[in-house]
Regions:
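Structural signal for interior beta-strand "rungs" in well-ordered beta-sheet cores
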Residues: 1-171, 176-177
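Short, charged, intrinsically disordered terminal tails
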Residues: 179-191
Length: 191
């Protein structure tokens, strides 16, 4: 079923039971299988499998929504973002280069570039929760299972292995060190 005013561009593949709301734009090279897309939503060059996408949400380009993913309304799932068996609540954003696996992400959460939910330990998968309003900085690893509290702020480059309290700033990274003359002593980059 395709709603009134929806535009579907060439090279789009719709498989199985697909429902697309009104006034959507489905861009070229998109594949949607057994999924529901809300109203006024834009999907650009992406793959959506057995998932739900809310109203006024933007997906892509080059996003991958794997089975059992649910994206709320007013969300952004940008380029090279993969979401698996997870929920992004209303207003959440994962703009680029992010992996969200087996997790629940609250309302108006911002996931910075390069955020990875580390959900698999080699034998079991674990689930994490990020509460409403949290800000997760660029290149953060959330080693599941962890719980990030409401309005918490996780600093860029951190690896999170413990829960983060509501409203807290969490920084987990080593102090940088510059070793002068190291390149020359090792003979690296000789011209």
């Amino acid at each position: 079923r395709i709603g009134k005013g929806t535009v579907i561009y060439p090279c789009v593949v719709l498989e199985g039971d697909v429902e697309i709301g009104e006034n959507c734009t489905i861009g070229q090279n998109t594949r949607i299988k057994d999924s529901i897309i809300g109203n006024d939503t834009s999907i650009q060059s992406s793959v959506i499998l057995e998932s739900k996408v809310g109203n006024e949400t933007s997906v892509g380009p080059f996003a991958y929504l794997r089975p059992n993913s649910e994206i709320g309304s007013h969300c952004k799932v940008g380029d090279f973002v993969e979401i698996k068996n997870s929920r992004l609540d209303d207003g959440a954003k994962a703009a680029h280069l992010t992996y969200v696996g087996d997790s629940d992400v609250g309302k108006k959460v911002n996931l910075g570039c390069g955020v990875v939910f580390v959900n698999y330990d080699g034998s079991k998968k674990y689930r994490s929760v990020v509460e409403d309003g949290a800000f997760i900085g660029c290149n953060v690893n959330l080693v599941s299972p962890v719980h990030v509290g409401k309005d918490a702020y996780v600093a860029a480059g951190s690896t999170i292995t413990n829960d983060v309290e509501d409203g807290a700033l969490y920084v987990a990274r080593s102090k940088g060190k510059s070793i002068e003359g190291w390149v020359e002593k090792r003979g690296i980059l000789k011209k």
